[in-house]
Swiss-Prot record:
Sequence similarity: Belongs to the SUI1 family.
Function noted in UniProt: Probably involved in translation.
Higher taxonomy: Eukaryota, Metazoa, Ecdysozoa, Arthropoda, Hexapoda
GO biological process entries: regulation of translation
Stored PROSITE patterns: SUI1 (PS50296)
Gene behind the chain: eIF1
Protein name as catalogued: Eukaryotic translation initiation factor eIF1
Amino acid sequence: MSIQNLNTFDPFADAIKGADYDVQDGLVHIRIQQRNGRKTLTTVQGLSAEYDLKKIVRACKKEFACNGTVIEHPEYGEVLQLQGDQRENICQWLTKSGLAKPEQLKVHGF
């Protein structure tokens, strides 16, 4: 009898599956990553390079009362990281601020 629940979960795995999930496809991918215990990270990938991501993170931190940063991912470029489950908040905020249309947002996670 083997234990099947010890597999690792890669939140970026579905972005690697096919060529249609390219950074240039116009989609903004919003993912959630499990850290330790109840702690989670929300990552946002695919925002246009013309936006200053540090200013976006600063506004999100103030709006959602959470911590955040911009990390440089080797495959996906600059990715926003926010602490906590901010998937719904970031979707509403991106559409309200005009940074992305609702049909451009693709939410991944549990």
